[in-house]
Amino acid sequence: MSQPITRENFDEWMIPVYAPAPFIPVRGEGSRLWDQQGKEYIDFAGGIAVNALGHAHPELREALNEQASKFWHTGNGYTNEPVLRLAKKLIDATFADRVFFCNSGAEANEAALKLARKFAHDRYGSHKSGIVAFKNAFHGRTLFTVSAGGQPAYSQDFAPLPPDIRHAAYNDINSASALIDDATCAVIVEPIQGEGGVVPASNAFLQGLRELCDRHNALLIFDEVQTGVGRTGELYACMHYGVTPDLLTTAKALGGGFPVGALLATEECASVMTVGTHGTTYGGNPLASAVAGKVLDLINTPEMLNGVKQRHDWFVERLNSINHHYSLFSEVRGLGLLIGCVLNADYAGQAKQISQEAVKAGVMVLIAGGNVVRFAPALNVSEEEVTTGLDRFAAACEHFVSRGSS
């Protein structure tokens, strides 16, 4: 018989790039999880905006099991029916004419940046290689994407970094305009900065970026890894703004918990990519594609997307009520079910401590830096789960405040 697994085993065996919670989840259903001891948690973290339909959704399980009984993998020397169906669904639902599949958001962003460089090289010459990104952004952990993310803490120990990447201030079109010129090949931006604090872009900012890119023949890349697939109440957040990118990256919720990512592109952009210019062994595998296809079927409906907007109101109303009692937050912001509670000056830097109190109370939340408590629950979270989870969060806030004043 094998030895029981404990949380301490993580500290013994794993490369220490994470600091996971003190419990190990073993079972989930809907927006509830249970740990090894049987304690129940309401999940408002959603696997960092991944579990868009909660845990163990029956239709996702059915799609996975059905494909698993056929075949799992062939490699990119062959295509398969699930990936072609998935590609058509994404094309029909968005601006895109072509799709490249991969396994994560970082890979999707890596592909987008490589495509942008190649597009500019082929059309305009090697001088046009500049990339403009934004401070406090997050685009992934590859060397290219971590360099595009404007957070030195994630990149400072890995020099030399890829060159020709500059960072403007987010939501500041004048700052961006000062950096975007005829040597710029692409601008990459999140419609809502997730890891950077749940900061929505303004309409004027995204529209201004579109105009600047058009003026300087640069590609506009929307990183919708966290905001995509219904998270904001539209299939993709850019649909709130009426701004169409040249490239869009998507992952996280696309697989509902199964690893998958995709780069969406116009025909013109995709035309510079030829056999061998990019690839991945597992991208577009039939298991991931079957699940993602079902995810899109379930999420891309008026009922589901309108339900996200309704659930946003449930959360914001109750979070404001909690804040009225405990005066923790200066602002509750976000779109749909990507919500950030910004700590006021009295509690600055203590988001992690609040998230730890929440776990003790039986509710899982995220942070976005030291000053923002982040919520990214399942898009189909029930009213009862919202009520129960926020009751527990209120208890955590009460304990946090009373502990600090004792």
Swiss-Prot record:
Biochemical pathway: Amino-acid degradation; L-arginine degradation via AST pathway; L-glutamate and succinate from L-arginine: step 3/5
Modified residues (N6-(pyridoxal phosphate)lysine): K252
A molecular function (GO) term: succinylornithine transaminase activity
GO biological process entries: alpha-amino acid biosynthetic process; arginine catabolic process to glutamate; arginine catabolic process to succinate; ornithine catabolic process
Cofactor: pyridoxal 5'-phosphate
Top-rank taxon, per record: Bacteria
Ranges in a coiled coil: none
Assigned keywords, A-Z: Aminotransferase, Arginine metabolism, Pyridoxal phosphate, Transferase
Family as reported in the entry's similarity comment: Belongs to the class-III pyridoxal-phosphate-dependent aminotransferase family. AstC subfamily.
Function of the molecule: Catalyzes the transamination of N(2)-succinylornithine and alpha-ketoglutarate into N(2)-succinylglutamate semialdehyde and glutamate. Can also act as an acetylornithine aminotransferase.
Protein name as catalogued: Succinylornithine transaminase
